[in-house]
């Protein structure tokens, strides 16, 4: 039987789950070199993120007597960041491969400052100080009288303030930053009345209103993901054991059970990857 060209084999391997890819590294030397290459890992991540299957991470509370790690709010290229309360270390972890790397605390002088620094102070102790990662940049809400979006490009290490937002005068307590379809989105809610979701176009620096929802149960929820373009996956704020799928066209709501788990503020999409940090 004639062997398949290696390019064809690569196309097949890109669609294989990460757990299987780790086993396939033992099949032959060529497969091992392919799977461990940065080029293949980047292609596998694109394939995983663009697939129809959706993986969710639900963060549950556990008793403080256990040695626990705080999970930050979303993932980046299949990696999550954990904080160790005992050692005060940050840990980058790949749930799919079990790879991890521990980073030293800031007091060890192994970190450097970004210059020029942020034009606004980032208060990490408040909900507005929580960063959102989208497509190579970190985003924060900032400003007092006028809501603005602060962006940090991780490639150029430069800050930028995104002003002229259509929600600039909204109550910051009703604004939530989310990554939907790999774009920065903000939901602006009027509880029990309306939820408007804005999407940011990073190329022309403009905001586009993509949804306006008046369903009561949805306006009190957190948007998680866009499904099939016309459906919005939401998480209730009531620590529920169910997620909601809102159909934009029919304006109907379906419930999705998550078993014994409860959802809260920390619910985000996750895509498997082979990525690690050298």
Swiss-Prot record:
Q: Which SMART domains match?
A: FBOX
Q: Which PROSITE patterns does the entry mention? A: FBOX
What CDD domains does the record tag this protein with? F-box_AtFBW1-like (cd22157)
Query: Which segments constitute the F-box domain?
Result: 1-43
Pfam families of this UniProt entry?
F-box, FBA_1
Q: Please state what the protein is called.
A: Probable F-box protein At1g14315
Organism phylogeny: Eukaryota, Viridiplantae, Streptophyta, Embryophyta, Tracheophyta
